[in-house]
Amino acid sequence: MRRFLLNVILVLAIVLFLRYVHYSLEPEPSNQPDTYSNFSSLAENESPADYDISYNEKKGSKVLIMSPHGGRIEGGVSELVRYFNNEYSTYLFEGLKSHDNQTLHITSTNFDEPLAKKKIKEHQYVVAFHGYKGENKNTLVGGTDRKRAKMIVRALERRGFSAELASSKSGLAGLNAENINNQGETGLSIQLEISREQREAFFDDFYYKNRKYTKNSEFYAYVSAIKGVLEKEYS
């Protein structure tokens, strides 16, 4: 019995240590002001090797699935975006630094990377994935397309996920006209703010190099719920 308890304590210690490492390497965005107020300032001061900009064109796609905070900026959102590569156009700005990727965080109302601006204007609808610090599994669904945002909430809840419509008064609602999400042809967007706890649960190993290989059933249930709404509403 004593050995069993020691083993349990050891396992818990390892889990807590790994969790600490994950958070220290990829801390969530803080309430501190961004280092850069726009992309040109970032590009002038950061090495091109420290970030990546990618765009996947899907001919005939009305929807652009994107995140300006991919890679190691808000862990787990890149994998969510890339899941949709075969059905929709996708865009990612990703942090690749070994540490301090929060310096690459540009808030969505200031994010003006040229390729993102160009491609968003070529699509009718935008679906953006983001991360926030929440310690409980939850998704705040915002954006200007409130009708479809509510549908996303219901679809996630039917799959057993905690989700809610972001309050219009919340800073995470994604309603500002300056938000990069809202600059498409129709101005209609869906913005998903996903808690850290929920994003970690999508992978058996949250370490950034291993995430794409360790997506689990919770990941696929989540994206399937979203995909169902997009196929019905934006086809």
From Swiss-Prot:
Location relative to the cell: Cell membrane
Superkingdom to which the source organism belongs: Bacteria
Pfam families the record matches: Gamma_PGA_hydro
GO CC terms: plasma membrane
Gene3D superfamilies (UniProt xref): Poly-gamma-glutamate hydrolase, zinc-binding motif
UniProt main location, coarse: membrane
Topological type in the membrane: Single-pass membrane protein
Tagged with keyword Cell membrane: yes
Keywords for this protein: Cell membrane, Membrane, Transmembrane, Transmembrane helix
Spans traversing the lipid bilayer: 5-24
Induction: Induced by mitomycin C (MMC) and UV, and this requires RecA. Also induced by hydrogen prexoxide.
Recorded family membership: Belongs to the UPF0714 family.
The protein's name: UPF0714 protein YmaC
Gene assigned in the entry: ymaC
